[in-house]
Amino acid sequence: KIQHCAFGAGVGLLLVLYFFLYDMTKTERGSFGTKIGVILATAGSAVGLGNIWRFPYLTGKDGGAAFILIYALFVFALGIPGMICEFVVGRHGGSNAARAYFKLSGGKAWWIVGAMGMLTSTIILGFYAVVAGWCLQYLYASIAGQLMGDEQYVMTYFQEFSTNPVKPVLCTLAFLLLTHSVVVHGVRNGIEKVSNLLMPTLFLLLIVIAVASCLLPGADAGIKFLFHPDFSKINKDTLLDALGQAFFSLSLGTSCLCTYASYFSRQTNLAKSAVQIAVIDTCIAILAGLMIFPAAFSVGVSPDSGPSLVFITLPNVFNQAFASMPAVGYVMSLLFYALLALAALTSTISMHEIGTSLLYEELHITRKSGAWIQTGVCAVIGVLCTLSCGAVNWLSFAGKSFLDWCDYVTGQMLMPVGAMLACLFIGWFAPRKVVHDEFTNHGTLRSTFYGIFLFCVRFICPVCIVIIFLHQFGII
């Protein structure tokens, strides 16, 4: 009966979302309607599963508040200037990423940067949807009470599910269709409206779970682990961790920010928006730490990072931490996986939009057709990634699954190269007047920080990205 209720709740949620979007006007190219819509939608593109399963772990491992300080410095030196680069290209072009680079470069081959971003985001969406589908399954399992058990049970549950040839595929396709249902309805009536709903909900869930976690006996050890400034832990690896997190957390190198900026109004302050988005992204990551570590330390569990943290470690933590209050543990587990699904959805929407906008504008087809093509391509990648996790052996080679190879190619090659080319283009090749006009909104804003921005883009950002690239390959 519980499973039937959970299934009905899931179907009901999809129907609510459908009718929420059904009467919206279908527009080929629109724009964000409000300032808060700009910030929430673009911040949603940056906020994702990495904020929850990587940043808190790095913070605790690398010196707590000391790591956060170093991370903030890299965000301002690399992340924010990199974001502004894509904002400048996107808003000036007012079109998909490839065409935006084409326009700003005067018809030169820089359009390849935008096309590369579309390729990168499509591959990422393919394998990201797999993990997002796992979030859906675990949300269902939480509702149905299927995650109650000891550590071995939780581990076995994940292994059996992730290697199943059918269930993960269905979950992946379901999440892609959920993403599709938002993107197909356009910018203002789809992406913006849903982001305005999802992001506040995400914040609320984070706060509720974090407060409950911090109130557990022994939670102070987790808070200390996360925030105590331990400068003795600062070393080369700490700096590289902070630099890499600042780069990957803000979706640089995927043309996502460029695509969203094409929907910005001419009155949007690009620099201010970049700072606000970076602050929101960091705050969510810190709240995620407050949600995870106090609960983990309260039961003596050493938290790790990545999928194993959220799909194996945390179910066990919830079961132990709230053993005397099983109803509370049930609710916390349910809220946590709802939060994960929402965080994943805000990211998949933006990745889907990159390819959708390029397809319907360049092929001169409707947004609906472009969205279906993008969904279909990502579905093929997603199914292959899902099956490579254990169901089909030939999809793994050289010690890596197809999913791992997709992650490797995008994270270690395409994203750093794309971000580097974007910075080089804005810093050295784009018309100076256009860049200055976009930064200052054609002189209506003060250009106090323009010189600092240009210096970072020309020198600091390329050096940082080269360091990230070399570190990814184990050279440094």
What are these regions (language model features)?
Residues 17-53, 82-87, 91-104, 108-115, ...:
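Membrane-interface "cap" regions at the ends of multi-pass membrane proteins
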Residues 106, 113-116, 120, 362-375, ...:
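C-terminal membrane-solvent junction of multi-pass transporters and transport-like membrane proteins
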Residues 27-30, 57-62, 92-116, 129-188, ...:
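Inter-helical loop and helix-membrane interface segments of multi-pass membrane transporters/permeases
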Residues 34-74, 261, 272-275, 279-282, ...:
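Transmembrane helix-boundary motif of multi-pass solute transporters/channels
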Residues 25, 132-163, 263-267, 272, ...:
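Helix-loop-helix connectors at the membrane interface of multi-pass transporters/channels
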Residues 12, 59-85, 167-168, 414-418:
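Extracellular loop-to-transmembrane helix junctions
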Residues 37, 45, 169-170, 280-286, ...:
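Loop-to-transmembrane helix boundary motifs in multi-pass membrane proteins
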Residues 25-28, 32, 36, 192, ...:
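Membrane-embedded translocation segments of transport machinery
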